[in-house]
Amino acid sequence: MTQDERREYLIQYLLKEEIPFGRQNIPTDKQGQENLLRSLMNVRPPRPISNDFLKIQDEYLTERNIERGITDVDTLAPVKSDSRLYIWQGDITTLKCDAIVNACNSQMLGCFSPMHACIDNFIHTYAGMELRLKMHEIMTKQGHEEETGKAKITSGYNLPTKYILHTVGPIIQWKVTKDCLLYTSPSPRDGLLSR
C-alpha cells in the first residue's frame, strides 16, 4: 500500500465509523486529506478499533513522522557550562529521545478539538489511536481526573520517542493583572524563589 492509499483507507474507515461524518467530501489534495485525517483522529472517542486499522495507521504514521523529520537527541550538543544540559527549540513530536512531556488536561485523553494547535493534540495525532485508548484504560482504572502536577507514563507508540510523560499543568483560576508581575523577575528561577 502506498502512503496515499493508507491515508485514504484511514479516512474512509473513520468516516464510515461516524455516520454524521459519512457525508463528508474527501479533499483531493494531499494537505486537505492530511487535515481531514487529523481532524477525524482528534474527535474520535476512545473505543475499540480494528487491528487492521491500527496496522495501516501505524505504517502511515511511521512514514509520516519520517517525512516530517526526526531529530535524534544524540546529534545535539550540550551547553558549554553543563554537559548534562541541552537546549533545543523545535517540535517535540519529532524528537528521538527517551521521553517527552505532554502538557494535557485533567481527563488525560488528548485534545478533542479538530486541528487545535496545542501540544496535546499534536502528540495524540502523531502517536496514533493507541495512545488515547491507553490513556482511557489508565484513567478508567484510576477512577478520577488527574490532579495538577501528577503524571502518567506511556509508550511513545508511533512517535520517535520511547515514552511520553503526561502531566496536568497549573490552571490560572483568576484574572491575570499587573499585580501578578510582582511575582516575576528577569530570571524565572529568582521569581519562583521570591514567592
Please name every model-derived segment.
Residues A99-I100, C104-S185:
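Glycine-enriched loop-and-adjacent helix/strand subsegments that border the catalytic/binding cleft
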Residues E59-A99, A103:
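Long amphipathic N-terminal alpha/beta scaffold segment
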Residues P48, D52-I56, I87, P114, ...:
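Generic alpha-helix structural propensity
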